[in-house]
């Protein structure tokens, strides 16, 4: 069946996982307290902090309590929506201040452009917020993407999440190709009927999915 849409992960597939682990997350941890103190009443941030309180049983969080909670979530590797919203805004400030530059593999932008020109619809699916995804993909041309999915549609290891995405795209599952460096995520996508390709930038890869060394090596059926 002809591929009509590509759904790609970012971390490890379009950009190095080390950019998130070694640059973005430490920056968010370092600036979290000051950001909350300065922006707790801003549109979007106030609502995110209120939602964080609701997740903890409906408590109204003081700024230091909110910081402690979000720091704990980051240490635990959790990604609740309030945390993702605030991280995205902190990273936006970092990008704008020149604290870091988005890292994207060099094959990504040309491949995205070629797929777009071929009439293939492009989407992302990441644990990060839409803002964070747009910022990370900025150098590759985030405007080529029609949409940015995050965990509001479901967790990336769950088959139902991919079924929900296919439904939202109004496409047969088999016409959507999922690109990821995470085989467990691809297993969930495959179980939902989507086509898959493992982006194995450091080599390796099992036999459950077609393997490509980079975006330029992906075979579009």
Swiss-Prot record:
GO biological process terms, semicolon-separated = L-methionine salvage from methylthioadenosine
Q: In which pathway does it act?
A: Amino-acid biosynthesis; L-methionine biosynthesis via salvage pathway; L-methionine from S-methyl-5-thio-alpha-D-ribose 1-phosphate: step 3/6; Amino-acid biosynthesis; L-methionine biosynthesis via salvage pathway; L-methionine from S-methyl-5-thio-alpha-D-ribose 1-phosphate: step 4/6
Q: How is the cofactor bound?
A: Binds 1 Mg(2+) ion per subunit.
The UniProt keyword set, sorted, is: Amino-acid biosynthesis, Hydrolase, Magnesium, Metal-binding, Methionine biosynthesis
The highest taxon in the source lineage is Bacteria
The molecular function terms of the Gene Ontology recorded here are: 2,3-diketo-5-methylthiopentyl-1-phosphate enolase activity; 2-hydroxy-3-keto-5-methylthiopentenyl-1-phosphate phosphatase activity; acireductone synthase activity; magnesium ion binding
Reactions the enzyme catalyzes: 5-methylsulfanyl-2,3-dioxopentyl phosphate + H2O = 1,2-dihydroxy-5-(methylsulfanyl)pent-1-en-3-one + phosphate
Oligomeric state and interaction partners are given as: Monomer.
Family according to the record: Belongs to the HAD-like hydrolase superfamily. MasA/MtnC family.
Stated role = Bifunctional enzyme that catalyzes the enolization of 2,3-diketo-5-methylthiopentyl-1-phosphate (DK-MTP-1-P) into the intermediate 2-hydroxy-3-keto-5-methylthiopentenyl-1-phosphate (HK-MTPenyl-1-P), which is then dephosphorylated to form the acireductone 1,2-dihydroxy-3-keto-5-methylthiopentene (DHK-MTPene).
Question: What name appears for this protein in its UniProt entry?
Answer: Enolase-phosphatase E1
- Source species: Xanthobacter autotrophicus (strain ATCC BAA-1158 / Py2)
